[in-house]
UniProtKB/Swiss-Prot annotation:
The active site is at D81. Belongs to the pseudouridine synthase TruD family. This is tRNA pseudouridine synthase D. PROSITE patterns: TRUD (PS50984), UPF0024 (PS01268). Pfam families: TruD (PF01142). It comes from the Bacteria. It comes from Ectopseudomonas mendocina (strain ymp).
Amino acid sequence: MNELQLLGPRAHGEACGRAVLKASAEDFQVDEVLDIPLTGQGEHLWLWVEKRGLNTEEAARRIARAAGLPLKAVSYAGLKDRQALTRQWFSLHLPGKADPDLAAAQGDDLAILRSQRHNRKLQRGAHAANGFTLRLTALEADRDALEQRLQRIAEQGVPNYFGLQRFGFDGGNVVQARDFAARQELPVQRNLRSRLLSAARSHLFNQVLARRVAAGTWNQAQIGDLLAFTGSRSFFLAGEAECGDPRLAILDLHPTGPLWGDGPLPTGGATQMLEQSVADEAGQLVDWLVKADMAHERRILRLPIGGLSWHYPEPDILQLAFVLPAGCFATVVVRELLDLVPAGQTDTPCEF
């Protein structure tokens, strides 16, 4: 499966040029934003961890091993990319225990920058946002067009597609999900089951969003839409009055798309017809998600880009900094600017 099949059309026109992303881990930096004041006491030890070339699950295993704890005693808010320099929180459940010596977990690819006690464990999805610093190298672009495009996406946002990372190499996770759906079976292994169910829901969401982008309605409220605020998991039905809400224009309020699960579609009008059409075409995949007891959820169609800034440290390097809500993909922001080409290696340090 190619990129267009897995995501959909761009909203702001063809790419303004091309560049390389992730020539080194420092080219893709992620800082988790967590709005939780720590108490300084309690049976949970929270760790602020920097890791390079290491995914979240691998880091959790390292920390658990060094602490002499079962893996289930280590918690984190969200998964971060392996091919990146990331900083995120972990928590260790240590009832009645002293802080462990975690030196064995640390090395060139993992450093514990801060630790503090708290009275609660870190829950999945607890982070409010992620801050990104991206360096795009080997830049070949129309600079004037790129500047205009950057201004435009800062003002209008971009389609909130799930990124290619969600689907595996050449969409392999979607292919596997369809195979299981055809047999109406669920993978026995928990991690595989979670990955394939997530890929299936993400793919169907992207299909709906792709049609809204093609129709020019991805950033507009329609009667029958379900609307949600940035960062909120609650939503409400749009009537004529709601479609004129001024908070839509300032990117606080957005139309949403389906994360499929059990129950009827809660949308109405043309929105429900479009979403039902995607469900009908997917057939077995939707039935499979229902069989897996997935609950129907919603995700905003439009991705607002917080605090977008940029500069050119070298003529052929574009450096971006911005903040996205949790669960959103920096690569879909870049996709509205540039085509990405395979990475070589670069020694240029990332300094914003």
